[in-house]
Structure formats: C-alpha cells, structure tokens
Regions:
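Alpha-helix boundary/capping residues
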Residues: 11, 74-77
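Sec-dependent bacterial lipoprotein signal peptides
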Residues: 1-14
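A general structural signal for short secondary-structure junctions and capping/turn motifs
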Residues: 2, 50, 118-121
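Extracytoplasmic electrostatic interaction patches
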Residues: 77-134
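N-terminal export/targeting and maturation segments
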Residues: 16-72
Length: 134
C-alpha cells in the first residue's frame, strides 16, 4: 500500500513540473509544441510565500496565430513605448535592443521590483518572458 502511495506522489510531482513550454501555454495561451524552438535560458525560482521570479528566453518563430493570441492578452506592437529609463531596463534584461517588428507586454506590479514583461522580436525570432513578484 505504501509503495502505491509513494508511486502516486511521484507521478503527481512529475506531472506538475513547471517547464517553459507549460508556463507559456498557461500564462499566454501560446503552444510552442510542434514548432521548432530552443530554450536558451530558463529560471523559475519561487519561495513558499509566493515571492519569486520566472525568466524564459527562447529562439522560436511564432506563427501569426500565436502573435494574435499575445495581442489578445494585451501585447502591443513594437517598439517599446514606456518611459525612457524603463525602456532601457526592459531592453537590457531581455537582451533585445531597438526591436521594431513584433510585440511586447509590460505590466508594473504593486512594488517597484514586481513586473510582468514579455517581448517577441519577429526579426530575430526571440521570445523573452519575465515575471517577478515580491
């Protein structure tokens, strides 16, 4: 009986693993499975009280239907239209400078360190997603 319980817990833990693909699908509705892509960086660190951050960078050529899904979630056309200091910070953390073709989403949290940011550069085919909650 104990073996079945432990096996069940193990299966549950494996099925709940957060992957870049699952995060993008759940948060943005974008499904990269079936597309050619490579995850160049992934960080997903959270503590028990809910504070933490997620950062995903991937090389992927999104079809127009996925770009339309991002727009339906509030993404705006590039270039980034934010105050200059915020724009420079977003370009620096994403590594995507002066992009003009693609979409981005930025939402400031309640605290200065909190934000939700996504950018997709259609020229370089780079998708970057960052979420920070403190």
């Amino acid at each position: 009986m104990r073996k079945f319980f432990l096996l069940g817990v193990l299966i549950l833990l494996v099925s709940c693993t957060r992957t870049p693909e699952r995060i993008l699908s759940k948060v943005w509705g974008v499904n990269v499975k079936g597309l050619e892509y490579s995850v160049t960086s992934f960080k997903d660190q959270w503590i028990g009280n809910g504070d933490g951050e997620t950062e995903i960078r991937m090389a992927v050529e999104l079809p127009q239907k996925d770009i339309d899904i991002l727009i339906s979630h509030g993404a705006k056309p590039l270039p980034i239209v934010e105050p200059e200091n915020k724009k420079r910070w977003l370009e620096r953390i994403s590594g995507i400078d002066c992009a003009t073709d693609g979409v981005y989403f930025f939402e400031q949290g309640e605290q200065e360190q909190e934000c939700k940011f996504l950018i997709y550069d259609d020229d370089s085919h780079v998708l970057y997603y960052y979420l920070s909650i403190m």
